[in-house]
Amino acid sequence: MNSSSSEVQVCVTGGAGFIGSYLVKKLLEKGYTVHATLRNTGEDRAAAAAGPRRGGASAVVPLFEADLFDAATFAPAIAGCQFVFLVATPYGLEAAGSKYKSTAEAAVAAVRVILRQCEESKTVKRVIHTASISTASPLKDKEAEGSGDGYKDFISESCWTPLNVDYHLRSAHFDKYILAKLRSEQELLSYNGGESPAFEVVTLPLGLVAGDTVLGHAPETLEHAVSPVSREELSFKFLRLLQSLLGSEPLVHVDDACEALLFCMERPSIAGRFFCAAAYPSIHDITDHYASKFPHLDVLRATEAVAVAVQPEVDRLGELGFRYKYGMEEILDSSVACAARLGSLDAAKLNVPDTVSSK
């Protein structure tokens, strides 16, 4: 642990979520002082406390009620912090009776307010945002580029999902999510090019995050990762959608994702957009792994033809010295183990019968 880490104050928005709760645990283990924001529910409070308990951390985390649909509520949590992790994502727009016309509009407005609050704090050195790699589709945009159908040769940080391009299994609901994440990330990155930025902004478009959780239930993305084994058709349909959108299935273990966030915090200086995914397999690579691991199970398989999985042009985080601990197989295997522990998968059915394993 850095001897000065206890003097560093960090704000984590969305501290009750999948990534937020795990990040809080990691920060406490390193001795940082953490402010966590959450919505005003008892369930969120219990989730936010789960990370420190499971991680063995004894520190008490100050919890601040805040809502992205009322971004001014984040000011008390940001006050006095040197680093701010933007992990929270707006949702439930219709139910919230929001003044905004869309989730994307709400997300951009929230980003602007939070950036202003960070400036007014006079203490914030860096804002680090958990973006989504779904905003970086390498689909070719015929209108903009004059090229044909299909994918670019590589996926890179210069890619932005062309929302005018159709693809197999496209979802109007997911389009809203992509648009909100895309617009808010672009708004954040534009801050670096301002006249006199008061701090640095980093965005990490994450792959499908899986592997483990400190929550008491399996997060949605982990459910997607194990869907070929669980045979949950809706979750598996999402995997197929990602394959169509991205040309591959970018994966990252939650522990690696949080280590990457910490890496970006602890560097002397860093700004810009950096992908965070340890592997870019195809959906067939994933189902083949599960079929090999569990030969006695009827693993769901995609019927769509897939060419070569689109790979990243460069590993920008890797060039800075970051290394992933978990590859594709470790991510998938630990996801299955976690889902079984939490009851989302029947652990008894996962055991390979002797008659099969001895062949």
Curated annotation (Swiss-Prot):
GO terms for biological process: defense response to fungus; toxin catabolic process. The keyword NADP applies. Pfam families: Epimerase. The keyword Transmembrane does not apply. The active site is at K181 (proton donor). Its EC number is 1.3.1.-. Disulfide bonds: none annotated. Keywords: NADP, Oxidoreductase, Plant defense. GO terms for molecular function: aldo-keto reductase (NADPH) activity; oxidoreductase activity. It is an enzyme of class 1 (oxidoreductase). Belongs to the NAD(P)-dependent epimerase/dehydratase family. Plants susceptible (e.g. cv. Pr, cv. K41, cv. K44 and cv. K61) to the fungus Cochliobolus carbonum race 1 contain a transposon insertion (Drone) in Hm1 and a deletion in Hm2 due to a loss of resistance. However, the compatible cultivar Missouri 21A (cv. MO21A) possesses other defects in Hm1 and Hm2 alleles coming from different mutational events. In tandem with Hm1, NADPH-dependent HC toxin reductase (HCTR), which inactivates HC toxin, a cyclic tetrapeptide produced by the fungus Cochliobolus carbonum to permit infection and acting as an inhibitor of host histone deacetylases (HDACs), thus conferring resistance against C.carbonum race 1 in resistant cultivars (e.g. cv. B73 and cv. Wisconsin 22). Catalyzes the production of 8-hydroxy derivative of HC-toxin via the reduction of the 8-keto group of 2-amino-9,10-epoxy-8-oxo-decanoic acid, an amino acid of the HC-toxin. This is NADPH HC-toxin reductase 2. It comes from Zea mays. The gene is Hm2.
